[in-house]
């Protein structure tokens, strides 16, 4: 499996609007592409900026190519991205997935599980 990472930064006051836009564009397109194994969208607010990190999981490079085009390292943007983002970062990064989590409901969550106090 391959992880494709992209990052971008917006004004903190526009973070919710950008997330909604991202969910309606990039996330939907990623999920609709054959070979996509999942998408994570992470956000970190730091003062007046909100940083987004998107991690998409893929079966192989051919599946990524179906989404991204021949140059799989080139970031893919949508029409309104320029209005939100401080910078259109031109490249994405790919990683080979070596270990993946087995997520269990309530385990390791604060306030979750039987051992919560």
Residue map of PLM features:
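Glycine-rich beta-strand-turn "strand-cap" elements at beta-sheet edges
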Residues: 40-50, 76-117
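Short, glycine- and small/hydrophobic-rich beta-strand elements in well-ordered beta-sheets
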Residues: 27-53
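Active-site-flanking beta-strand signature of metal-NTP-handling nucleotidyl enzymes
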Residues: 2-8
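Short, surface-exposed ligand-recognition loops at beta-strand->loop->(often short) alpha-helix junctions
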Residues: 9-22
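An amphipathic, aromatic/His-enriched active-site/gating alpha helix that lines ligand/cofactor pockets
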Residues: 21-36, 57-93
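Amphipathic alpha-helical recognition patches that constitute DNA-binding helices
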Residues: 5, 17, 53
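Short hydrophobic/aromatic beta-strand micro-patches
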Residues: 9, 42, 55-57
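Non-catalytic surface loops within mature trypsin-like serine protease
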Residues: 12, 60, 96-99
């Amino acid at each position: 499996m391959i992880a494709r990472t992209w990052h971008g930064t917006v004004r903190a006051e526009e973070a919710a609007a950008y997330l909604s836009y991202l969910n309606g564009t990039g996330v939907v397109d990623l999920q609709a592409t054959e070979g996509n194994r999942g998408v994570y969208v992470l956000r970190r607010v730091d003062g007046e900026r909100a940083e987004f990190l998107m991690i998409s999981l893929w079966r192989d490079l051919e599946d990524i190519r179906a989404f991204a085009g021949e140059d799989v390292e080139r970031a893919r943007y949508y029409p309104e991205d320029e209005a939100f983002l401080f910078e259109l970062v031109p490249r994405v990064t790919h990683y080979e997935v070596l270990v993946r989590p087995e997520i269990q409901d309530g385990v390791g969550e604060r306030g979750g599980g039987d051992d919560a106090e």
